[in-house]
């Protein structure tokens, strides 16, 4: 819609309204892959520069109490993880950061990779 910035959008926000634990990923293909693998509590932030205080507020208002930060394994992903963690902790939302190897992103996950990086978290969803 006109006047809406990608910086204001979390996708697919309505799909996670019943979860108190959310997984945040960078891109659309990342979130689609995680949903395909059964991690339906995942949201896309549309790029490392696009997590804002507005998005932290939205998650807080949706009742999110814990966030797993799952950015790509590159430097931009690592820097974004730190920024996201600070913004969420200002709203008293617990965070866990999963650090991926340099050349891996969640969109590349198969079932084994998802289980390796996220399996221990799934029981808390």
Regions found by a protein language model. Give the residues of each.
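Phosphate-handling DNA/RNA-contact segment within nucleic-acid enzymes
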Residues: 1-66, 80-81
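Replication-associated primase and helicase/ATPase modules
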Residues: 23-24, 60, 65-70, 81-125
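Short, acidic/turn-prone active-site loops that include or flank metal/cofactor-
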Residues: 46-51, 72-73, 101
């Amino acid at each position: 819609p006109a006047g809406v910035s990608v910086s204001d959008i979390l996708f697919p926000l309505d799909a996670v309204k019943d979860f108190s634990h959310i997984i945040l990923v960078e891109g659309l293909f990342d979130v689609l892959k995680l949903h395909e693998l059964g991690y339906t509590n995942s949201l896309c932030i549309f790029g490392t520069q696009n997590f804002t205080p507005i998005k932290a507020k939205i998650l807080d208002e949706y009742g999110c109490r814990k966030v797993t930060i799952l950015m790509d394994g590159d430097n931009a992903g690592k820097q974004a993880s730190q920024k996201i963690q600070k913004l969420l902790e200002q709203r008293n939302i617990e965070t866990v950061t999963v650090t991926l190897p340099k050349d891996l992103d969640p969109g590349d996950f198969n079932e084994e990779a998802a289980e390796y990086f996220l399996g221990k978290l799934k029981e808390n969803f």
